[in-house]
């Protein structure tokens, strides 16, 4: 007798071993038809897996997130089935689930074309119509090896070799096609009707550019057609907002092959960058941070001492001079400890907050580089707080408040906060972890906002809080972080004199709000589709004449605006005013001032916005006040109050 406990507390008894599908059938035919997989004592299993002892069982359907992920994984296998039918000589590699979809890496002598992708998608749809069952077979290791040897699937054999402890492997049969997976998968292809292949790209076996190149086909799959349509609309909107396209259209930056992963900032883009830096400089100064600057290139001895040379060497750019090895810094922390170490500190001086707009370089794989979002050279709004254990909570609480306030200034009010706790492999005592985790949790509670735990996701030396922003397309971007670190100060011999006149190692809090300027700017460009709030716009105002007679007056108005601290330019070209307005609107300049004879005579300006609104005629002083109010508002969705 096997007793199955359902989520509502009801218990169903079966004479012997049963399955998730049989449990669903015992509840009702509608549920059985909708069953994709199940959870047995919390573990995801196939609907056909045997349940041999008493257990708690949940039915997984397409309405569950797990159900949608299983649909996506099974659609990746379906893609493999279609590809092998159309191109029998290719070799299948891996086909995992990713956010909103899946991909499959394939080795093929001949590159796939868009026509091939269309043919694959068509064949997948034909296979789905056959409504065949997906059969799972737990297969002895040697038999699985024989199956893939007979099929010439070299990469599957390499993957099996990576798992020497596995005596039995899960093989999923899509008719004649066989794939290997831990599962679970859908029981029938009728669950896979809502899918679309999205794009193709190159990849490398095991992600290493030294290995052979593979072809990656990306797809998406959903439980409902409406969800697929909404996703495609989001993708199309995201493509329109691609920061690389907008960056080119607005003349913000470019990148080129001679310097992969490094940004060439143009005047417009550099203006936004400088506004960002000046803003963060003021914010940090107002909150007790001291700005410093540390070297770009540092001897390997410091990186060895900090642990980076041993653990991070492949991601570091190195150089040699006069028989000494150096690294271009990939991060700022070891250098900040060197500044702290100059002169013995007293506990009365703590906390000490050291901030740097630190220029860092990391040797990221070339295939992973993506515009401003993934670069090799970047600047962090980096800071390190040296404090006592007792000061952690207050410092973290202040940082949370500051970070959320900064995000509001950029127009982000949907923030996710997550606390990553101790991993299995860690340094330090359980007591020190208890104190650090409680300090971070209490600081999060003091914010009055929702947050969640990420158990086991902390670094080996301490817990951390991550801040993620939701943009205008609903995408989530991880940006800010604050990390407790007692390890690096100890490795680099940082000390202060405590109240008992004894030497003690400080706690170091690594923190960043924006993350990297480059990535944050890429996010802003896509969030606003290039329509930057007035305070961030490279040019805030353009002053335009109707005829040559108003040229001098336009120059005078522009000078007055510039003297008031506004970023203003003139457009005195001998073109029709309608043409100039259209062109400057495409440049996303927030305000356009038009001067004709009437405006010159009255000493006023005619004000239009890039949204096409005519604000009418006003004095230059009134216009300056209008812009200054918009600048003070920043990107906030509501007006900033005195309390904020």
UniProtKB/Swiss-Prot annotation:
GO CC annotation: cytosol
A Gene Ontology BP annotation from the UniProt entry: threonyl-tRNA aminoacylation
Chain intervals for the UniProt region annotation (Catalytic): 242-533
Cited Pfam families: HGTP_anticodon, TGS, tRNA-synt_2b, tRNA_SAD
Subunit structure: Homodimer.
Homology family: Belongs to the class-II aminoacyl-tRNA synthetase family.
UniProt-recorded name of the protein: Threonine--tRNA ligase
UniProt source species: Psychrobacter sp. (strain PRwf-1)
Gene this protein is translated from: thrS
